[in-house]
């Protein structure tokens, strides 16, 4: 990870400090305040806060961001083109409940798609094949525990509960992203 930005420019001002928020972050070269007490209110330096979470995540095996901070919370991967539509339905159902989900519809093998989700630190990866399409029981890779589980969409929603967002700004299909 790069060195801490010594002059964070994004600040959130609040009267009530969220519980458990770190006060500062220190790497091998610098220590930067995350929270400044301004007497009656607090300034939270967002750049330093995000750096803190990246630094902490990089210490984990596998590395993982808090679910609320992950750009993509759930990646849905069809095992072949026949299941892209089912994958889209699952991702749209997750988005409708306020979660950041996308579909890896690239013309690549399953292994590459799973590896891509891993390099992007996606917390939950849903694999959709014939069995999942027929039974509705999803195969879900849970990054934090490095395990694969079978669960319904409702059970996945229960795992995600409390991490809803207002809108996903990420295109539904990976193939629709630029670059």
Language model features: what each stretch is:
Residues 1-99, 104-106, 131-179:
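TRNA-recognition modules of translation machinery and tRNA-sensing kinases, especially anticodon-binding
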Residues 110-114:
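Short acidic active-site motifs
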Residues 72, 122-123:
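Short glycine-/polar-rich loops that comprise or flank the Walker A/P-loop
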């Amino acid at each position: 990870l790069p060195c801490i930005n010594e002059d964070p420019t994004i600040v959130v001002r609040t009267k009530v400090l969220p519980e458990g928020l770190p006060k500062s972050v220190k790497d091998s070269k610098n220590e930067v305040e995350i929270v400044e007490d301004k007497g009656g209110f607090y300034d939270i330096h967002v750049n330093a806060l995000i750096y803190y979470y990246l630094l902490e995540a990089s210490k984990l095996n596998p590395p993982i961001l808090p679910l609320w901070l992950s750009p993509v919370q759930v990646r849905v991967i069809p095992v072949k083109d026949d299941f892209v539509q089912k994958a889209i339905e699952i991702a749209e159902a997750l988005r409708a409940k306020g979660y950041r989900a996308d579909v890896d519809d690239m013309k690549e093998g399953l292994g590459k798609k799973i590896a891509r989700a891993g390099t992007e630190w996606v917390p939950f990866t849903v694999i959709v094949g014939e069995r999942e399409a027929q039974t509705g029981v999803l195969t879900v890779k849970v990054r934090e525990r490095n395990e694969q589980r079978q669960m319904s969409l409702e059970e996945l929603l229960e795992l995600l509960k409390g991490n809803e967002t207002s809108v996903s700004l990420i295109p539904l299909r990976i193939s629709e992203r630029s670059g």
